[in-house]
């Protein structure tokens, strides 16, 4: 699935940068088209392996009033109505990615009204995608988990610049100069057109 993901994403969710969408999908469903996640109650003992099996399970969960997420982007069942999804279409990879793009783009456009910095707005949008709130996704660790899927490492801790007595430790005179640090967060920078991210 991962080998096909870039092509599907470019066709079905072109307004979300592939790096962002890939990190999101890896965390949400591990790129499993038929993934079903139970939010409350006992989790599925095994995941469905066919579209028919996934549809049958989803219909049973809805019948029982179970709160669950489905498909590549783990779209919550409570959002299916306004996204035009059902127990069959939610497991179509293209339709599911379109829905994920719709949710994320909506969150991002609203986050931009609160955050002038586009990367901060992006993180707030990820929080919104998970919780419907710009802050709870930070508190529950979701945002950091998605960032980790993007391969972004936490930078080394630095001593406070306010303490003038602190001096950098000299390891060796022959030590090569370190490379400049990359920007925090995503290494790609979005532009405001439709939640698209571009490389520096």
PLM feature spans:
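Non-catalytic cell-wall polysaccharide-engagement segments
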Residues: 2-19, 31-32, 48-69, 73, ...
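Conserved hydrophobic/aromatic packing and binding residues within compact polymer-binding modules
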Residues: 24-25, 129
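A mature extracytoplasmic/lumenal domain signature
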Residues: 25, 74-79
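A short gly/proline-enriched turn/hairpin at secondary-structure junctions
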Residues: 35-40
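Eukaryotic N-terminal accessory cofactor-binding modules
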Residues: 44-45
